[in-house]
Amino acid sequence: METYYREEELKSLGLKKYGSNVKISRHAIIYRPEELEVGSNVRIDDFTTISGKVTLGSYIHIAQTCGLYGGDAGITMEDFTTLSSHSLIYAISNDYSGLSLACP
């Protein structure tokens, strides 16, 4: 079994957009893939979780066990950036909309 999704498998993930030479680990977790935009020459390693509105530029490496939680606000990583292992990025820390119970 290959470590990263093949090109035809990337199509079936339902990503909003992706460029060329994209490597996403089969062990990465992507929630709401229809909101994930990925540029070219991007690698996402094992056990990374991506959720919500996330935009990744080109020439990006996201190491293992990272978390990008974009929610509705969104996260953007610009070109030529890296995220070291175990790093977490939150667009918001809680839901203050009043539409649901948060932190009971």
Annotated model-derived regions:
Residues 25:
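Conserved catalytic submotifs in the C-terminal HATPase_c
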Residues 2-7, 28-38, 43-104:
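Flexible, glycine/small-residue-enriched loop-and-beta-strand segment within the central core
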Residues 1-18:
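Extreme N-terminal tail/first-helix region
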